[in-house]
Amino acid sequence: MGSALLTDPPPEKPRPSQQGRGKAAPGLDLSPGQMLRTRQYWLCAGAVCCSTPAVLLFSPSILKLGMERGLDEKSALWSVVLGSVGSAAGRLLMPMLSDKIGRRPTDMILFAVSLGLSAVFWFAQGWAVVAVYAGLTFCYSALAAVLPALSTDLFGFPHAGVNYGFLALGQSVGSLAFPLMANLWGLEQGRHILAIAGAVGGFAAIWALRPVQPPRAPRPN
């Protein structure tokens, strides 16, 4: 009796990840070469790059920063502990939210929150350093966790692994380029300015992101 109740395949509920395409619209199965020729790839990779400075510019020296801003060494260690908690929470919670409201709105929320926290972090003192840093690690890890689903939504499933790898190159570029720029600019002020600029750039890139249009079928002669 149970088998009589099953349908093959089971009906699929509409999801935000379908990018607003109608049910009759063909799915996208872009190869890495095709993906690299799209505007959407460069916007996504740019957003990934811009997500890095808010955390990676500060994580190597977060203990020192906490002590410089009024914490003793034992208290400053909580920035590492709560930063890890924030990272884990971001990876678990925000992909769930993106399943409900869509990847693009989720990423825009995360970049907006990261922007606000980066501005507050510039002036944070004492335990506020710990709290704000935990919030920044939440946003950073959440953006990374949503990226594979965003990649699949935009470019299709068959080449999802390689396509995601190309998108993740943005993180590698950001982790190298932003510290270099901060060192050239001056570590203390430059790090905060670059973190704010990165959040603005990431928000703008995701705001400009639109679904990849499927190739048009050739017109019959």
Residue ranges and their predicted role:
Residues 1-22, 204-211:
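C-terminal membrane-cytosol helix-exit motif in multi-pass small-molecule transporters
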Residues 100-111:
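Cytoplasmic membrane-interface "Motif A"-like loop-to-helix N-cap segments
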Residues 91-102, 186:
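Helix-to-loop junctions at the C-terminal end of transmembrane segments
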Residues 33-96:
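Extracytoplasmic gate region of multi-pass secondary transporters
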Residues 154-187:
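A late C-terminal transmembrane helix in Major Facilitator Superfamily
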Residues 142-155:
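Intracellular juxtamembrane helix-capping segments at the cytosolic ends
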Residues 113-125:
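C-terminal ends and interior cores of transmembrane alpha-helices
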Residues 182-198:
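A membrane-interface helix-boundary motif in multi-pass transporters
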